[in-house]
Amino acid sequence: MAAKVENGSNIRKIDVKTPDGKVDGTIELPAELFDAPANIALMHQVVTAQRAAARQGTHSTKTRGDVSGGGRKPYRQKGTGRARQGSMRAPQFTGGGIVHGPKLRDYSQRTPKKMIAAALRGALSDRARNGRIHAVTELVVGKTPSTKSAKEFLGTLTDRKQVLVVIGRSDETGAKSVRNLPGVHLLSPDQLNTYDVLRADDLVFSVEALNSYIAAQQAAGTSTPEKVSA
């Protein structure tokens, strides 16, 4: 279900679900974070930079100067009828050096923080406008992890395949319950990024994580935090 927008207000509200299927109040999604313009070109640039930074860059080949041996001329300069050669480690020989091969390099790109933040706001806003952001009190009841219970609960929230679950770092019970579920990716609020948001069909926030994320943006001067209301 799409987020509800109050009349004459730019504040979106979504229901807070409990594992037993009940609704425990609502939570507000500030427009500054969840109703921002989605700049596709910007999101593409940020995701490209993020994926590039994840590349290891440890590939390396040897040029003719790096390959061992080849110091002696393989045969005399004249009189053989063959093309003159100075080293058996030249690129045209088996065992020779590699021409224009990959070398060690850093693929990371410098992306301004404001661009990264704007891209994330655009991605979150797109999901919010399409009713793909959900809030929950917790993933499982109690302190005992249960993958079965977490899977069933997520199934009541969405039937789409890729789900991004955002919970607090201290929620070990929730983390252990969903970490082995296929199609479910787990992050803490401070790890939210454009790539993972766009890759997911739906986002499931715990109330704690959502409030934490909004508060962090407030501290950065982006938005005003909103708390859960009954």
Curated annotation (Swiss-Prot):
Any GO MF annotation of the entry: rRNA binding
A Pfam match: Ribosomal_L4
Keyword Magnesium: no
Family: Belongs to the universal ribosomal protein uL4 family.
Domain of life assignment: Bacteria
HAMAP family: Ribosomal_uL4_B (MF_01328_B)
GO biological process: translation
InterPro entries: Ribosomal_uL4 (IPR002136), Ribosomal_uL4-like (IPR013005), Ribosomal_uL4_dom_sf (IPR023574)
Assigned GO CC terms: ribonucleoprotein complex; ribosome
Function according to Swiss-Prot or TrEMBL: One of the primary rRNA binding proteins, this protein initially binds near the 5'-end of the 23S rRNA. It is important during the early stages of 50S assembly. It makes multiple contacts with different domains of the 23S rRNA in the assembled 50S subunit and ribosome. Forms part of the polypeptide exit tunnel.
Protein name as catalogued: Large ribosomal subunit protein uL4
Stretch list, region Disordered: 51-105
Family annotation (SUPFAM superfamilies): Ribosomal protein L4
Subunit text: Part of the 50S ribosomal subunit.
Keywords: Ribonucleoprotein, Ribosomal protein, RNA-binding, rRNA-binding
